[in-house]
């Protein structure tokens, strides 16, 4: 149910969804679709090279890192790791802040600290209270790099140092933060090309690449369906 315009009451809707109209796509596959299609859901010139190459999709978000590999045109597996992502970065940053300054920042308060770029240290002596602001950009950067290195180490161990892969496709908000590190780590691998998930739609935030791919697939599917009628 939902409210429409100035209507004070909720209006209920009933929808019937048939199984034949349900299509499930894994999250990282949305990015593969996205980098292969233009804004009219038409295949780009480079679409063929992606679908005929060995690809590892690296989807780092807030809570998890999802890895999806395609080798010899076959989707092999999807792996999910909860210890890599922005949540892990913030938790590690919080630990470093507490170790250095003795201040415990709750997860709910971390967003405010990030927006300010600093946190407040409160000291009390009797009835006298003093406060001072302290930055933590260095701790955040160190935590970001550490979690990224752990994630890359996992990838290297699981996928034979990416020796068989042509493309490493980065998608997800945390991947955008890690991009400089990842490019540095893999720059000497001749065969491997690092590609951002929004390479053909740079004005789109990378967190929406998967969704764009779903949408483009839907348009393509509806177009094929209309032609078949």
Q: What label would you give each PLM region?
A:
Residues 57-63, 115-123, 148-149:
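Short, functional N-terminal and low-complexity linear motifs
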Residues 1-55, 74-77, 82, 86, ...:
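Nucleotide/phosphate-binding catalytic cleft detector across ATP-hydrolyzing
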Residues 68-110, 206:
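Glycine-rich phosphate-binding loop plus the immediately following alpha-helix
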Residues 54-76:
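Basic (Lys/Arg-enriched) interaction patch that binds polyanionic ligands
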Residues 99-141:
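A mobile "lid/hinge" subdomain adjacent to the ATP/sugar-phosphate binding pocket shared
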Residues 63, 174-175:
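Gly/Ser/Thr-rich beta-alpha loop segments that engage phosphate groups in nucleotides
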């Amino acid at each position: 149910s939902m409210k429409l315009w100035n209507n004070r009451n909720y209006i209920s809707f009933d929808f019937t969804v048939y199984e034949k109209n349900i299509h499930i796509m894994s999250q990282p596959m949305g990015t593969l679709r996205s980098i292969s299609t233009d804004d009219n859901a038409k295949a780009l010139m480079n679409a063929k090279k992606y679908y005929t190459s060995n690809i590892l999709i690296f989807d780092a978000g807030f809570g998890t890192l999802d890895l999806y590999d395609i080798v010899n045109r076959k989707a092999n597996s999807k792996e999910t790791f909860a210890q890599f992502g922005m949540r892990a970065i913030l938790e590690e940053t919080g630990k470093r802040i507490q170790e250095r300054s003795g201040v415990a920042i709750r997860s709910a308060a971390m967003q405010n600290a990030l927006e300010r770029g600093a946190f407040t240290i409160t000291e009390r002596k009797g009835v006298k209270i003093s406060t001072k602001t302290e930055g933590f950009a260095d701790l955040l950067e160190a935590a970001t790099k550490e979690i990224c290195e752990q994630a890359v180490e996992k990838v290297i161990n699981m996928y034979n140092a990416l020796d068989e892969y042509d493309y490493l496709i980065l998608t997800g908000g945390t991947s955008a933060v890690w991009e400089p590190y990842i490019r540095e780590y893999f720059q000497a691998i001749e065969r491997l090309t690092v590609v951002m998930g929004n390479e053909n739609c740079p004005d789109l935030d990378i967190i929406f690449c998967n969704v764009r791919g779903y949408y483009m697939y839907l348009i393509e599917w509806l177009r094929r369906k209309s032609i078949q009628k």
